Amino acid sequence: MITESNAAPDLAPARMVNEYVYCPRLAYIEWVQGDFAVNADVAEGSFRHRVVDQEGGALPERPEEGEKIHARSVWLSAPEERLTAKMDLGEGEGALLTPVDYKRGALPENPERSWPADRVQLCAQGLVLRANGYGSLGGVLYYAESKTRVEVPFDEDLIEETRSAVAGLFAMAAEGKPPP
């Protein structure tokens, strides 16, 4: 819980950036007030996440060219982006990495084939990878219910949207009251 004597942390979890894009009030309740309710959806998501939440390897500090990387449940931070992220999966070759984020739900029926909050969370993971010396041109959202992988390029518009969401999350936390 964030209080006046306990100012907002320096880093926002990528997951909270997702919540902020989805519903700023929910992000405030969960991140600032520290009130997180476990419901049936959360329990099911945790069950589906059990494999990717097991540590399956670390990212090499200086990957060799052509070295295959497949690391599960990797935590990285990027103070310059004010972000921290737990990636379900980092896969790639050499210094080029693709974050893969698992979602329990179905593939949305929209032109992007993904939810805006999910794209922003994934891009936040890409920004964290970049800040740690990896190349990351895009990511993958895996919608478990549909068993579908969706590639998401990290273009300038998505990067700007992601950084704006991070700034908005911190501004909201500094307000000291939940948004309507």
Regions found by a protein language model. Name each.
Residues 1-99, 106, 110, 120:
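Metal-dependent nuclease catalytic cores that hydrolyze phosphodiester bonds in DNA/RNA
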Residues 99-101, 142:
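Short, acidic/hydrophobic/Gly-rich beta-strand patch recurrent on exposed beta strands
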Residues 120-127:
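Short amphipathic alpha-helical face segments that pack within enzyme cores
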